[in-house]
């Protein structure tokens, strides 16, 4: 049958069906029929019902229907990759929603054809967030309508409610969706990879995009490549319905897809593991729910579910396997039932249509139909009282709502003053006020996807066609080149508002004399040369700043360096202007050439890295002062005392450091930048250099912590190489050690081909015998280095964390182009080493939280334990400084201090505020954890909540034992016992004498850092018992200053006493 099914719809096109009224009557049978025609291969199909069929006579009476939780969809991103945040709004009626949707601010723009509207959608996705009336529980079908009634489809999914009495809102009950222009549903498959049905009752059309199930893994790999941070947090992060990827990006990476427009009165059917997304053209109303066939059972057994939220939809497959796959039930329970899903095969119910290869005819035989399996579930539907929904524990299919709006999203983003007019839709640049949620680390401005929308008329070509010119075009920005980042008064749109300078601004008219006039300059030529170089450094930069502002000429003011004997001549303004012009020209050329393969260019003479080298001759012997020596005793800095670049080179110290780091998981010098994050998040690694884990010799392969995107992202380019060089199928990579300096790296992180991975392998620096070369982007030695511009060297980890650094040869991870790093980034001072060095050196990164100015070198931050983790595109690394460390994260990882009776603590009072209180008594209570039959869970049950046995007398049930649980709604539900958890409880007493029993998570010691939510509700008294309210000393205030009447109005002045008498 496989070969037969492959001939059906081989191009995986979205198919449209027009059933007759007779064919339309049996829903499950018609679904089986369209699968026999190959409709399921596209992942999406359209069904146009007979003209005589209507689910509702009129929709004029629904204006008072309440939309309880509308969501405003705030979209951030660029270049075809977006993240959608749902912000819940107050309830409104359909009448109010329609009025908003049809207003000038939210209405559909004018368009002549669908392709034009589609282009406007993707270009203006981040502007003017629309409101979506999603997830409204209910149906608009009239009661007498039996055909394709979304409220009672009578498929095998109804067994969930029949067997367990469980209803899951939006899954086996219908949901209504009220849309407006630009409201979107992000890329996702259905919960548990079920089927879904969507009927558009009335209003404007809805556009759909679909990826065939057989190519779903490719879409997941693409999404994980662009959003590695989300992928690490949750394997099934696309189920969050927050990721929007444009069809242009799909075509660019060769992922097959198709698109279709759903008109009012039409059905859309999605199939298991069919990724789909789309948007509404204007005000409309749709109704949808999920259903299942026998083919789905295998998908449900293998579905990868969201792991970051326990209340996500999960359906127990036990009843389905037991009923429809009895021969495999025991194997499945033992975890040995493994089967590869063939996405091309239709559902078993389609066998009758494949036998005769004819059309859909009335069924003559008595062949079993899914309807009959669940017929009993519908009997007595009206007479029986339905079991109430346990709202606290049953997952519902709802859009993921942001509980807290990201702090970087301003109010102006949520409620822009005015929408783009029709003439502004061709804008290619996002306004400065509409920045992404996370501020950009790059000096390159965020640019909207301005590419012409391609024609996808033939999806078969989409599979193989590779776009050759998919790159952000910036022809319109020639008047404003990238060198604007050199201006000291950098605007936030250019640098993301994140490059903060500790020094004051220097005037562009400063002369060389004012910057380098040193009366005590010695007469030897070496010293004089260093003075000239210092003068060149400051004046060079200032002159370029003048050009960046568009002055058109260099700053005025004659050089006034006092020449001493053999001192070289000073640099003229004309030469500096030539340097600036040369640098500006190179920037423009670099922007227009292909990013990944362009050769390394030499750095301009005025570049900070060149100037640092020029002025470093007199600082190579820089010694630490006694005060600075004392600082080296800090815990994180002590092992690095011999590795600072301002100390004499010490190759043996580097080698010893590399050997120590090789012993620590993940045993790779490059992956170490994410070590702190994995320590805190997963508790996987040792805490200090001294705690060596397994010997390096025994560890030949480990899984790299750095996603491939970190090596390929360059700020604004979406050119990601999806291939991961030198990685095994299980995701691990070989570890290799340099025989000379002992640095240990993954072959994939350092770009070591398997042929070269041997005991004789040497790193690039040792191969070039450049043992005294240091990283030009930081201030520490040791680690894995690669060659950069002008024969300089950089740490691979520094190049990964600095967004603007670029790996020219991605596979070999070298050379590294640092010419695109904005000059203001070199002005930042590292908070860790600024006291250890007499001069500023290297290039810093900054904390990613808001506009936090905290800056540090990558290597310093890694050594000090700053948390760095993979971020989502267009960023690379998300950095959390010590000021923004989340207290809850530390508390959750076992860092809680012990508490004793009589200790003063802070806890939550019954009035909802936090007060200081005293621990009176410590007790231990036992809570039970169970998994309910519907897939939900509870971990805070009391023993008396188990009604199937007396747990107070007999103790907890055995693990895995089936139990009956009485829930808070009074109903009894089936569940399986997981474990019992003895929890330490604390009885605390407040100042007003009231006492509460709380868990450790709800108690804060006086030494702990309080979360913001606690600080904002912290008070010093309980129930009006204020400290010293009657004994507080009276505050003496100065008498009011006597008012002096203006002489011009003295005659008009009336004494207050006289005024009151007149008024009386």
Curated annotation (Swiss-Prot):
Domain named Tudor: residues: 897-954, 955-1011
Positions of the UniProt region annotated as Disordered: 354-384, 434-489, 502-537, 549-573, 590-643
Gene Ontology biological process terms from the UniProt entry: cardiac muscle hypertrophy in response to stress; negative regulation of autophagy; negative regulation of DNA-templated transcription; negative regulation of gene expression
Domain JmjC: 142-308
Phosphoserine: modified positions: 523
Alphabetized Gene3D superfamilies for the sequence: 2.30.30.140, 3.10.330.70, Cupin (2.60.120.650), Zinc/RING finger domain, C3HC4 (zinc finger) (3.30.40.10)
Main location: nucleus
Catalytic activity: N(6),N(6),N(6)-trimethyl-L-lysyl(9)-[histone H3] + 2 2-oxoglutarate + 2 O2 = N(6)-methyl-L-lysyl(9)-[histone H3] + 2 formaldehyde + 2 succinate + 2 CO2; N(6),N(6),N(6)-trimethyl-L-lysyl(36)-[histone H3] + 2 2-oxoglutarate + 2 O2 = N(6)-methyl-L-lysyl(36)-[histone H3] + 2 formaldehyde + 2 succinate + 2 CO2
PTM field: Ubiquitinated by RNF8 and RNF168, leading to its degradation. Degradation promotes accessibility of H4K20me2 mark for DNA repair protein TP53BP1, which is then recruited. Also ubiquitinated by the SCF(FBXO22) complex; leading to proteasomal degradation.
Biased composition (Low complexity): 509-525
Biased composition (Basic residues): 593-608
Start and end residues of each stretch annotated as Interaction with NCOR1: 597-638
Residues that bind Fe cation: 188, 190, 276
Keyword vocabulary terms for this entry: Acetylation, Chromatin regulator, Dioxygenase, Iron, Metal-binding, Nucleus, Oxidoreductase, Phosphoprotein, Repeat, Transcription, Transcription regulation, Ubl conjugation, Zinc, Zinc-finger
Residues recorded as bearing N-acetylalanine in the entry: 2
EC numbers: 1.14.11.66, 1.14.11.69
Compositionally skewed regions (Acidic residues) per UniProt: 368-382, 473-482, 615-634
Function: Histone demethylase that specifically demethylates 'Lys-9' and 'Lys-36' residues of histone H3, thereby playing a central role in histone code. Does not demethylate histone H3 'Lys-4', H3 'Lys-27' nor H4 'Lys-20'. Demethylates trimethylated H3 'Lys-9' and H3 'Lys-36' residue, while it has no activity on mono- and dimethylated residues. Demethylation of Lys residue generates formaldehyde and succinate. Participates in transcriptional repression of ASCL2 and E2F-responsive promoters via the recruitment of histone deacetylases and NCOR1, respectively.
Quaternary assembly: Interacts with histone deacetylase proteins HDAC1, HDAC2 and HDAC3. Interacts with RB and NCOR1. Interacts with VRK1.
Similarity comment text for this entry: Belongs to the JHDM3 histone demethylase family.
Name under which the protein is recorded: Lysine-specific demethylase 4A
Organism: Mus musculus
């Amino acid at each position: 049958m496989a070969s037969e099914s492959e001939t059906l719809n081989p191009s995986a096109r979205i198919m449209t069906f027009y059933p007759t009224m007779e064919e339309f009557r049996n829903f499950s049978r018609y679904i089986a029929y369209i699968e026999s025609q190959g409709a399921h291969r596209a992942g999406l199909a359209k069904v146009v019902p007979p003209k005589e069929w209507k689910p509702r006579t009129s929709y004029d009476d629904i204006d008072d229907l309440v939309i309880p939780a509308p969501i405003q969809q705030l979209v951030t991103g660029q270049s075809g990759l977006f993240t959608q945040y749902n912000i819940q709004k107050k309830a409104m009626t359909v009448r109010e929603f329609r009025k908003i949707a049809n207003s000038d601010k939210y209405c559909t723009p004018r368009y002549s054809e669908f392709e034009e509207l589609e282009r406007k959608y993707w270009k203006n996705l981040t502007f003017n967030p629309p409101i979506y009336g999603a997830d409204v529980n209910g149906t608009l079908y009239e009661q007498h309508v039996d055909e394709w009634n979304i409220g009672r489809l009578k498929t095998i999914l109804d067994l969930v409610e029949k067997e367990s009495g469980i209803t899951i809102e939006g899954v086996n009950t219908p949901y209504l969706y009220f849309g407006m222009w630009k409201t979107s549903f992000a890329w996702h498959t259905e919960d548990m990879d079920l089927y879904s049905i969507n009927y558009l009752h009335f209003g404007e059309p809805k556009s759909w995009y679909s990826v065939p199930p057989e190519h779903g893994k490719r879409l997941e790999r693409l999404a994980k490549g662009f959003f590695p941070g989300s992928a690490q947090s949750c394997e099934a992060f696309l189920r969050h319905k927050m990721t929007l990827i444009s069809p242009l990006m799909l075509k660019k990476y060769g992922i097959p897809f198709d698109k279709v427009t759903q008109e009012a009165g039409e059905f859309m059917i999605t199939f298991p593991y069919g990724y789909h997304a789309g948007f509404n053209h204007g005000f409309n109303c749709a109704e949808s729910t999920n259903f299942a066939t026998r083919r789905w059972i295998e998908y449900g057994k293998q579905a990868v579910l969201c792991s970051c939220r326990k209340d996500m939809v999960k359906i127990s497959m036990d009843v389905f396997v037991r009923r429809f796959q009895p021969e495999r039930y025991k194997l499945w329970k033992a975890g040995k039932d493994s089967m590869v899903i063939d996405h091309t095969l239709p559902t078993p119910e389609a066998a009758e249509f494949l036998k005769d290869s004819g059309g859909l005819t009335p069924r003559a035989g008595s062949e079993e139909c899914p309807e009959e399996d669940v017929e009993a579930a519908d009997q007595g539907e009206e007479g029986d009282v339905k079991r109430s929904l346990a709202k606290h524990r049953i997952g519902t299919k709802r859009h993921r709502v942001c509980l807290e709006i990201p702090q970087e999203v301003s109010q102006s983003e949520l409620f822009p003053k005015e929408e783009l007019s029709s003439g502004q839709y061709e804008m290619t640049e996002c306004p400065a006020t509409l920045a992404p949620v996370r501020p950009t680390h790059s000096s390159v401005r965020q640019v909207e996807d301005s590419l012409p929308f391609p024609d996808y008329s033939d999806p078969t070509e989409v599979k193989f066609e590779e776009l050759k010119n998919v790159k952000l075009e910036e022809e319109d920005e020639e008047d404003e080149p990238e060198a604007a980042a050199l201006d000291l008064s950098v605007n936030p749109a250019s640098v993301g508002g994140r490059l903060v300078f500790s020094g004051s601004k220097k005037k562009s008219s400063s002369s060389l004399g004012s910057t380098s006039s040193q009366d005590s300059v010695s007469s030897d030529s070496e010293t004089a040369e260093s003075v000239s170089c210092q003068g060149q450094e400051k004046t060079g930069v200032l002159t370029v700043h003048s050009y960046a502002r568009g002055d058109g000429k260099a700053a005025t003011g004659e050089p006034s360096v006092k020449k001493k004997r053999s001192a070289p001549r000073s640099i003229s303004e004309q030469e500096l202007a030539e340097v600036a012009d040369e640098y500006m020209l190179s920037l423009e050329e670099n922007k227009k050439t292909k990013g990944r393969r362009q050769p390394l260019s030499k750095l301009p003479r005025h570049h900070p890295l060149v100037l640092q080298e020029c002025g470093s001759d007199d600082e190579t012997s820089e010694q630490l002062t006694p005060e600075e020596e004392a600082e080296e005793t800090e815990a994180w800095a002590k092992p690095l005392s011999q590795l600072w670049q301002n100390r004499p080179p010490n190759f043996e110290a580097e080698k010893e450091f590399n050997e120590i780091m090789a012993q620590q998981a993940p045993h790779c010098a490059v992956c170490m930048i994410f070590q702190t994050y994995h320590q805190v998040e997963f508790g996987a690694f040792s805490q200090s250099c001294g705690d060596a884990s397994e010997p390096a010799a025994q560890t030949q392969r480990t899984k790299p912590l750095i996603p491939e995107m970190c090596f390929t992202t360059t700020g604004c380019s979406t050119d990601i190489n999806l291939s991961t060089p030198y990685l095994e199928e299980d995701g691990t990579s070989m570890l290799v050690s340099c025989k000379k300096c002992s640095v240990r790296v993954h072959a994939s992180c350092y770009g070591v081909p398997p042929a070269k991975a041997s005991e004789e392998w040497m790193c690039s620096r040792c191969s070039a015998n450049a043992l005294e070369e240091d990283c030009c982007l930081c201030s520490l030695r040791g680690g894995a280095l690669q060659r950069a511009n002008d024969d300089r060297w950089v740490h691979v980890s520094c190049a990964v964390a600095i967004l603007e650094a670029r790996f020219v040869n991605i596979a070999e991870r070298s050379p590294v182009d640092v010419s695109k790093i904005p000059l203001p980034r070199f002005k930042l001072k590292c908070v860790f080493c600024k006291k250890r060095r007499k001069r500023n050196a290297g290039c810093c990164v900054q904390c990613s939280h808001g506009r936090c100015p905290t800056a540090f070198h990558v290597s310093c931050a890694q050594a000090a334990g700053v948390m760095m983790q993979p971020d989502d595109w267009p960023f690379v690394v998300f950095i959390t400084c010590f000021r923004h460390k989340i207290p809850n994260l530390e508390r959750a990882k076992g860092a809680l201090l012990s508490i004793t009776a009589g200790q003063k603590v802070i806890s939550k009072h019954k009035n909802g505020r936090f007060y200081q209180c005293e621990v009176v008594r410590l007790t231990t209570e036992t809570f039970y954890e169970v998994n309910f039959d519907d897939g939900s869970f509870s971990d805070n049950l009391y023993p008396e909540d188990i009604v199937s046995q007396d747990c107070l007398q007999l103790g907890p049930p055995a693990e895995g034992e089936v139990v009956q649980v009485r829930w808070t709604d009074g109903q009894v539900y089936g569940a399986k016992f997981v474990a019992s958890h003895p929890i330490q409880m604390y009885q605390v007493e407040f100042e007003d004498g009231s006492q509460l029993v709380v868990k450790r998570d709800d108690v804060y010691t006086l030494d702990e850092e309080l979360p913001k939510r606690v600080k904002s509700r912290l008070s010093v008294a309980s129930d009006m018992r204020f400290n010293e309210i009657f004994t507080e000393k009276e505050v003496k205030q100065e008498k009011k200053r006597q008012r002096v009447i203006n002489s011009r109005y003295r005659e008009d002045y009336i004494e207050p006493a006289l005024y009151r008498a007149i008024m009386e």
